[in-house]
Structures are given as structure tokens and as C-alpha cells.
Amino acid sequence: MDNTIGPRVDPSIRAFDFTALFEECFLDILPWSLFLLMLLVRLKFLLNRPKIIRVDRLCLIKEALWTLYAVVKLAQLILWASIAAFTTAGTVPAAALAFVGCMGGSVLSYFEHCRSRRPSSLLGILTLLILLCDVTRVRTMWLMDQPRAISILTTAALPINILLLVFESLTKTAVANEKEASRSKEEIVGILNRSVFWWLNSLFILGRKHVLHMGNLPRVDSKVLTSYAAPKVYERWESKPQSLMLQSLQAYPMTLLRGGLCRLFTALFVTSQPLLLKRTIRWFSEPSTPVSDAEGYGLIGAYLVVYGGRAVFTALAQHQNYRLITMIRASLVSLIYDRTLTLDLVEAKESAALTLMSTDVERIGQGLQFVHEIWATPAEFGVAIFLLQREVALGSLAPVIIIIVAIVGTVLLSMKIDPHQKEWIGAIERRIGSTTDMLRNMRGVKMSGFEDALTSILQAMRVEEVNISRATKLLFIGCQVFSTATATISPVLGFTIYVLMQRAQGKPGLASSSAFTSLSLFSILSSSVYIFLTSVPAIFSGISCFARVENYLVSENITGPTDAEGQDSEASSISAEKISIIAPKIAPSDYLLVIRDGSVRWKGQEKAVLSQINLCIEQGSFCVISGSVGSGKSSLLYAILGEASLKADTFHISTTSIAYCQQSPWLPDISVKECVLNGRDWDEDLYKRVIHACALSEDLAQLSAGDHTKVGYEGGTLSGGQRQRVALARALYSRRRLLLLDDTFSALDPKTEKSVSGNLFSSSGLLRELGTTVICTTGKPGNSNKYADYTLDLNKEGEAQLRNTQKDMQDDEIEASTYSREQNGPKKQEEDANHESNQSPETSQEHELAQESVPTFSSMIFYLRSTGMGFFALSFSLSLVYSFWQNFPTIWVNLWTQHDAKHPYGDLAKYIGVYILCAVLALVTHTVVTWFVNMACNGIDGAAVRAGPTRDTPENSGTASITGRGYVVFTNKHRAPMSYFESVDIGTITNHFSQDMEKVDLEIPLTGVQALFAFTSALVQLVMLSIGTKWMAITFPFIIAILAIIQRQYLKTSRQLRLLDLEAKSPLYSHFTETLSGLATIRAFGTHKQCQSINTERLDCSQGPFYLLYCAQRWLTLVLNLVIGAMAILMMGVTIKLRGSTGAGYIGLAFVNLTTFSQSIQSLLTWWTMMEASIGAVHRVQQFEKETPQEDVLGQVTSPPHSWPKAGLIELKELSASYLSSVSPVLRNVTFTVQPGQKVGICGRTGSGKTSLILCLQRMIKINSGSILIDGLNTSHVPAKTLRERLICIPQDALIFNGTVRLNLDPQSSFTDKQLQDNLRRVELWDLISSKGGLDATMQDGLLSHGQLQLFCLSRVLQKKSPIVILDEVSSSADEESQRLISKIIREDFKDRTVISIAHRLQQIADFDIILVFSQGQLVEQGSPEDLLGRDVSLFQDLFSQQDK
């Protein structure tokens, strides 16, 4: 009998065993043959790789073990050959193959050790597989009647195999180079280690013992980082830019394939469970015999294989899936950023990039979670229906029909998701764009008193977004109802059809084995269908987001200047004849820039901004472009840069080496030194010369950390003049051939402007020495104009005239300070003589972030209180009711089969009727809970947002949903002091408004309700497990204790990873936001690669916790599934002992509930892990509500009378102030009084404290000592928001945000359209704006120039009533005509009001009543203009006289 293929040997020979020939063929020959084939392929690959690991003790031990193993196999071969009587046809070939395989294993082990960074996967699988096979072979050997020597040798091979398995799985440490030593643990451990996620244990130990932060977080697999993942998609996209989704999936074929194979094995194990259950019930019903008892123990092994295999392969399939998600995330974010760098400036204002890289990429990831479910689950329910047909015959048609209806319904609903989701994401996009605008301009928002107005606008946008989201959520709910219907209705209809058919045919009714096997199949069927129908809308949503990203990537790039025929004009294409038309006396080679008959227009505008432009610029010359406000000066520079459309008969530029200073300086949030270096190599001498030339030495000396001081977001820690000069220093340090300056001196005081102009443009100036060609725009006569070689005059009609400028290059006495190469820079730079790097030290905040309390149970309580504990109690109760009705039918079926066995078809109507009632009640309660949680939260959300800003007080706690409450908390950030916004990364706040709101708004209701269903179902199923096998109830306390230990181990680390995941995204968002605001500068300097490098670095930083959190979740999936497997094995063991003492129905009941319990746990894990990040977002809401500082301290402020201020009297007494308590004062002992109606001008060098004084008046910086009184009331006792609303203030930088002209003019909706039009007419802008759409026109780049924007902001306050008007350089970008208009408005419209105006153009304040002169934070002069100008020594006189020169 042993010489047959069997597979089972005759029980009379050996009980429950395979034949010897079967074992030799399938447990020896097959695995060794496959190994030898794969050995050849692997060796060919390894021979082409370099040696990266040294031969060490581990290598020698493995070689020794393989040699010993080969010796044992050789001895077996010799013995078998010598005793032919005990062999079969396969004995000698099997032994020979094993010997050859051991020799091959020895060779492969050596090469794998030396040329692969991780232990051999092939040898790891081989040793494990051979070990399992040999265990079976050893048992057979000892049962067979043969020489003991063979059995002894076979047994002796087992410990050697075990040692090989251990040593072949050990991590290698003798690395040959530093690169390999820096690999992550996942990259260097073996396949068995990776399969059970053993490598993650060190992370959990670290998370339990220490606080996780970015500094101690383990490295992640390099293949999920941007440097590896992004090029895979980028190369495919560049070669074939279509179907981004397919390109992304095809870029990682092995990851996709490995995930698919693991999912296939999972499906095999899942569909094996009903067959195993059927065999168990039949075995339980059979009489006890030695053979059947042996089979019982064999069933324990079967449960070990099925449940253990399912646990491992489920975790591996999900792990490969989430690796795919992580890699696609890296590639998409990188692609979006790269595309953003080529984005048109007008499109950049729409903030699509932020939404795409956050919301859309997140939803793509959510859809990709189900990428293998879309094919695997249909396969599962196909197999389940086939097996079901064998049990209930035509009863299997019921689930088929229901599945078809559910799938068709779900697909139809999912197809409708796309347009609704696009509308929803569009609303999110608009909200995030407006929110980002508000945050970027928070200083201007506060100074203008628009905090509440803009917050109300944001809240209205939030309400609109919530309302738009309802349609999408309803469609998701509909899909869930279809999937639930399969689970609730299929079993009852299937059993009803089967029983009625059986009765009609006179056959036996419902048997216990068929009933519970069918229930198990129905459970698998419903679970598979549920996952499939859940995955369909998620995948459709992901496809929709892929399409949005794809549309963004293929949108039109910026177009450079073109000639009249539309062909790109290269430097080599210009002809001497064309140049000679404009400048016949100069050789063409002398020109750096030539434009002939050029016209400039912005995208989306038909009318040209400039026309008939003729311009010839010699190399090394200095050209000034002058013109009135709105004449197109900046547009011409943008056209030269390629940002605006330039068409010309001739366009020639002989260099791409361009530096650019835009009118509103763009400075990333890094140190001053890093801004100046801009990624270039350190040159100490040049750096000192540049700092001195830009007159920054004195400014840097006053900063707390010198040139290592961070400039803040958009240069918020610097004054306007300092920002312009730092940007200028960056341009000078770049040493470019062409320098474009867009009104760069507008914020400089006359003395500083004169000094900088001389240092740069005089005959011995730095730019003259470097031979740099300069084109500078200006709207006013200035010190730089007299150095110009050419002047291009632009008029309001967009026409230009080029003329030579008569220059007097004689330097006067003041110009003695002109740039000198030997002049020393600031002392701070002297300390850096040995500086070798352009990177300054930065203080990491990661550890501080990580030390924040992580989300705990209190976060969930916070969420539940926000939605209302009654709301949660009702939801939980209804969910428990659903779970009962969903699971009670298993008990009912057991009662039915017992009754049917005694009374065939007795009380059939009762059993069918109750079953139908249970199904209907389950479906109804499920639908109610799903709708209630999703839509009721949505309704509460809108109400909470409309309720407006609130703090958490006993009166309102628990009255609003976390979604609405969270947004209110975030919008309340405008109540924080300005120092908060200057110290907090704007990306962090943007992250709150995008990621956190996305998670709290969408994910918690959708995933939370599913997790709730799974949790209550698991509770009910545990009870039913104890009903099936009462002895199992004894183990429940131990199981619960084990689960509690696992939960504690997991949550301690996962909470911190969730927080790090959210925090690590903030710098990424900040960089996106900074890039969008500085596109023109980035492209002008050509620092694309530097910006891409920063993006890659920050993206990789966020990939770490993002990926590790997914890995930790897979570890939890594996461990809990192994616990369920242990429960199944334990239950089978209990079943063996209970055999004959209980009915088979109860055993079936127990195992069915174990199957459903495992599905509930799997579902709970799936939905809970999806909800984890949302819980982290809830925690952040909780933290920010608690920790965000407030400007007003309760009890220290009181609301002033409604009529305050009435007169406009301002008194400052011994005032000292600083931006932060740790920083030296910016104002020192300032004392003065302004009488009602007086006009006060403030002047002084840039950085002298002028703007700081205005900020003090508005309580925007910290007052250290002294007081400010307005109409006798101390402003420190007035709520800051109220104070700013009662004053009129126009900040230095024009405050413009996304929206219409009407919204920008009147955010508070206080005036009629006619009043707004009259205001625009007063500043002479109405004709221009009305021609572009009037009040409904959208504010965008190109609509108004910088000077016109200042006039626009002035028109905004003309109708506002307040006795005090504060103006911060409102004419800095205005031409002379506009300055006269502004002066007229101040004299006429504000004649009875107190006016405080900062000005660098001193003519603007020459007719004011009082002049205040500041220097280094102190008031050094005050008096009337006449008095100060008449003094022998006067700083004001000095400034005034330098401006006139």
C-alpha cells in the first residue's frame, strides 16, 4: 500500500497517515525540485552583484550546518540504496534530490550572505517548508515497519533543519560599507521576520519606554521614500502622460503582484473554513474509534494551518497594499509639486495644489486600500456560492439575485459620486484657499479689524461645504445599505427556498451539518459582498481624485515670450538688421535684451497691458522703468521672466542668468543668512560685501540672533524695508548677469535708499563692478534714477518711450559711504570666517511636539461630548440591537434543526417568519444607525458652524458636533496674539484646516459607524460562542486579558505615530504654501531643484510616521487574527473532549460564531485603523482649543462704550514693547501725545520701530511697560478685537484675499454697491475695475498693480466711521500723481480725524501738524515739519534733504 500515490494509507496498516510514495513525491521531490530550479535563477542574479557583506562567524556557522545537513542526507541516500526491500519508486530519487539540494543550499547560502543585504528569502522558505515536511516524514518513519537507522537519521535531520532555519533568518551585521549599515530594519531582516512583523517589536518597545519623535523614529524602507518611488511614476508619466491611475499602478508591478498573491492565499484559507466546519460537525456526529480520534487531532492541525495561514497572509496582503499606497503617495505629491513649479501665476492663486496633495491624495489612498478586494471578493463569493449550491441546492439562487441587485445598485450610486465629490472637493478647495489667504495675511487682517468678518465668511464657506457634502454621504450610505441587505436577507431566503423545495420533493428537511455549513458560507458570502460593495464607492472616489490630479498635471504650463509668429525666440535668432532699427550705433553682440514692437497681456485677459514696447538694453547698463500707477511696469518685468505673455516682432535675451526682486519680497521661513545664500556655496568675502552694500549691517546687529535669525513666514519678523533689502542681498549674492528690481526701494527711508543706491549703482558700486545689467521699476523719482543709463517711460495707455538719461556721476560728500571692497561687514559675520556650510543650525521642535500628550481615551470622550452623550448612547443602543438581530438567527437555526430532526417540517411558518422578522429588523436598524450617525452629525455640524466662535464652557459643552466645533476652534485662532502666528508654522495651521477637517468631517462618521457595528457584533458573538461551547466561556477572561495587553502595547505606540504623522505633514504644507506665493522668484533664480530637494526631504520626513503607522496596524491585524486562530484550535480541542456529551448543532453554532467573530474582528480592525488618524485629529482639536493662547485674558478687559473713541486723543507714556518676552525691546520709553484731529507723520530709518509703534497701538505686540491711552481709556483694558475694529488702519502690504472686488472692499457687508462704487471713483479706480467686471470681478494677479492696490485699500475705509486713522506707508508703491491723490484724500476725507501716517516719502507728510522721528526704537525728535527743518542739526532735516537729492 505504501508504493501507491494514495494519498491516504489503508487504516488497517497505519491510522490516519499518508502513503510513503505520496510523501516522497510531494514532501521531498517536489519542494527540492522547485528549490533547485529557483537556485539557478537566483545564483545568476547574485553573481552580477558586488560583495557588500564580509565573511564572518555567521557565514561560517551556516556553511557548517549545510555541510552537516548534506552529510546526513548522503547517509540516508546510502542506506536507502542498500535496503531496496523497504523502498518505493520514489525513495532513492527523493534522497538523491535532497542531497543535491543541500549542496546547492550551501553554495547559495554563501553568495546570499556576501551579496545580499538581507537573509535569503529562498533559503528561509525552503528550510521552513522542509521542516514541516520532515515532521510528517518522521512520524511516518517511526510508524512504518523498517530499519530503525532510517528513522534515526530522518529524526537527526530535524534539529539541523531547525538550526538552519534560525541562522538563515538572522540579520547580518558585518556590512562592508556605510551605506548598507544605514538601512532600515525592514530592509535587512529575513522573510519570516517580515512575515510576522517581528522587526516592529523594537518600535513598540521604544514607544512604550520613550516618547517618539522624528529624531528617534526608526528608518523606513528606502523603497517607500521619494527618491525611489517618485521616479517610477515620473518616468512613465513623462513618456506617456495619460491615465495617471494606470501609470501609477504599473510603476510598482512587484508590489502589486505580491499583494495580489497574498490576497489569493487569503481567499483560499477563507473559503476553506466552511469545508473544515462541515468536516468537524460530521466528525463530531460519528462514533468514537481510534481512527476517528486520530482524525480529530488531525483537525486541530488543519485549524492551525487554515487560521494561521489566514492570519499571516491577511496581514501580508494588507502590508503590500499599504506599501503601494505609501509609494503612490510619494510619487503623486512629488508630481503635484513639480507641476506647481511650472504653474501660471494666475492659476497659483486658486490653491488647487494644496487640496490635491492633501484631500485628493488621501482619498486616493482610501480607494487603493481595496485595490485587491475588487477582484478577490468576487472570487470568494463565487466559490462560496458554488459550495452553497452543494448544501442548499436552488436556495443558493437567492444570494445570487440579491448580490446582482446590490452590485448594480452600488455601481449606479457610485457613478453618481464623482460629480458630487468634485463639487465637494471644489468647496474644500475654496475654503482652504480663503483660509490660507487669511493666515498668510493675518497681520493685515488684524490691523484692518477684519477678524470677525473674514471668520464669518470662512464659516459660511464651511456651512456651504457641509451642505454640499450631504449628497456624497447619502450615496455612501446607500451603498452600505445594499451591502448590508446581502448579509441580512440572503440566508433567510436561501433557507426558505431550500426547505420549501425539499418538502415539495418529499426529502428530509434542514440537517444540522448543512445548516451550519451554509451559515458559514452565507457569512463568508455576505462579508465578501460587503467588502466589495464598500470598496466600489471608495475606488470610484479614488478614480475621481486621480482624474483631478491628472487634469492638474496636464494643464497648460507658463509660456515664455514669443515672436509675432508664435515661435520661441532664441538669442541666436535675432538679426543685426532688426536691432539696428532701434539702436543703429551699437553692435548686436553688445545687447543683453532687445524687444521690438512688443505687447504684454495676462492669461485670461484679452486686452494687452502694454503695447508697442521697444527696448534695447546694453550689457552692464542700468535701465529704470518709470510710469504711473497701473501703467504696466511690473507686468513688463513679468513678461521678461516669462510669467506674462509677451509677443513681439523681435525678442532677444542673451542670458538665462537672471535675478529678481519682486515688489512684495518673497522670503521663505529660514534664517537671514540662508535667505541670502539661497542654496549657493558659502563665499565669506562676497557675503560681507553684499550685506554692507544693502546696508544690513546695522539691522543684523539689532536682531537677537544676528543673521541666524529666522525671517518668519513671509518675512514677518522683519520690517518692510528689511525684507526688501534681504531680498536684494539674495539677488546680489547670486551674481547673475541680469537683475530685475520691481520697485525694490519703495519701503526704504531716504537715507537708507541713498546709501544702498550709491553702494550698488555708482561708478564704484557693486553692480557696476560685477558688470550686472539692471532693470529697475519705480513709480517715483529716487536716488537710484540719477545713476540710470536708460529710462523707459510708460503711460497709462500701456505705451512706452525709451530715452537716454543724462547722468551726473559726480559723487557728493554723502556718497563717501559708497561701497568699498575693504569695508567690513557686521561683527556677526566676522565670527563666521571659517564657515563652511550655508546651513545654519536650527532648533528642532519635533521633540517638543512629541512630548505633547497623545490621543487617549479622553480624546474619544471629547468627541462624544461634542456630539452629545445622548447621541452616542442612542447610536450604541441601536447598533447593539442591530447586532442582536443580525446574529440571533444562528441560535434560531440551531433550534430549527433540532425541532426539525424530531418533527420534520413542524412549525415551519413560525421558524421562517421569525427568521424573516430578524432580517428585516436588522436591515432597518442598520440603515437607521448609518443615516443617523452620518447625516445627524452633518446637521449638527452646520448648526455648530453657524453658531459662530465659542470656547468650551460648561454651558455649551456637548452642544455641537466635533466637526462644527473643531472648525470654530480653528477659526478662533484669529483671537490668538500675533506672536503666535509668527512662531507657529503656517503649514501646521493649514494642516488643521485641510487634513484634520477632512478626517473629522468625513472619516469619523463613515468609519466610526462601521467600527461600532463590528464592535457590538463581536460582543454578541462572544456571548453566542459561550452558548455553543460553555467550556469556552472559561477562557474568555484570559482572552480578554491577552487582548488588553495587546491593546496597551499597540496603542501606546500607535497614538504617538498618529500624532507624528499629522505633525510631519505641516512642514510639507508650509513648503507648498511658500512655493505658491514665491513662484516668480523661484523660477527667476532657477532654484527649482533646490525647492524640489526641500520638498523631497519634507515628504520623506512625513513618509516615515505615515508608513510606520500602517505597519503597526498590520502588526495588530496579525496578532489579533492569531488570537482568533488560537481560539479556534482551543475550541477544537474542547470539542474533542466534549464529543458525545453535547449535540452537533451546538458545536456548529460555536464554530459559525467563531467564523463571524473573526470577520467582526477583521472588520473592526479595518475600520478602527482607518479611524485612528481621525482620532488623532480630534486630539488636535482638543489640544488647540486648550493650548492656543488668547490675546484677551478673562477679567482683565472690559468692553468700552459704543461711542468710544469719540475725540481721537492718543497718549503714550513711557512705552516699551517687544515682539516676544525673550527678545530685546523694539520700542524704548516712547512718550508723546496726539491731540484730536492732528495729523502726525512718523519717519525714520527702516527697522527703527515705526511699524512696531502702530502694532502697539493695536495691541499686536507685547507691551513691557508704560501705557497707551485713547480718549483717556487704557487700551490694555480694551478687548484687542474691539480696539482694532474701532480704529481705521491700512497696513503696509495691501490686504487682498480670494473673492470678488465687492468682498475685498466690504468684507463686513456694511455698505451698498453705490457707496462702494463712489469710494472707487474717489480713488480713480472705478473706470478700470468696471471695465473688468465691476464689483463682481475676481481679484487676481494682473487686475490691479501694487500702487493701485494701495489706492484700493484706501477706498475700503472711506465710508468707515472712526476718529482715528492709521496709515502704514500707504503710498510706498504710488507714483507722484497717486501720492497727490492720497494727500488730497487725507486732507479732505480725514480732515476732522486724528491721522497717524508712516512715510518714507517725506513730502507726503511735509504738511502734517507733528513729525515723530524714530531711531533704534526710540523717539529721537518730535515737532512740526517747519520746526524740524529749521534746526541746525536735525535727523528729519537730514532725511528730507537726502530724499530731494
UniProtKB/Swiss-Prot annotation:
Function: ABC-type transporter; part of the gene cluster that mediates the biosynthesis of gramillins A and B, bicyclic lipopeptides that induce cell death in maize leaves but not in wheat leaves. May be involved in the secretion of gramillins.
Membrane topology type: Multi-pass membrane protein
Pfam families given in the database record: ABC_membrane, ABC_tran
Name used for this protein in its record: ABC-type transporter FGSG_00046
UniProt biased composition (Basic and acidic residues): 824-835
Family of the protein in this entry: Belongs to the ABC transporter superfamily. ABCC family.
Chief place of localization: membrane
Compartments it resides in: Cell membrane
Annotated keywords: ATP-binding, Cell membrane, Membrane, Nucleotide-binding, Transmembrane, Transmembrane helix, Transport
UniProt cross-references to PROSITE patterns, sorted A to Z: ABC_TM1F (PS50929), ABC_TRANSPORTER_1 (PS00211), ABC_TRANSPORTER_2 (PS50893)
ABC transporter domain sequence ranges: 595-821, 1210-1441
Record-linked CDD domains: ABC_6TM_ABCC_D2, ABCC_MRP_domain2
Secretion signal span: none
Keyword Cell membrane: yes
Positions of the ABC transmembrane type-1 domain: 259-541, 974-1173
Organism taxonomic ancestry: Eukaryota, Fungi, Dikarya, Ascomycota, Pezizomycotina
CC annotations in GO: plasma membrane
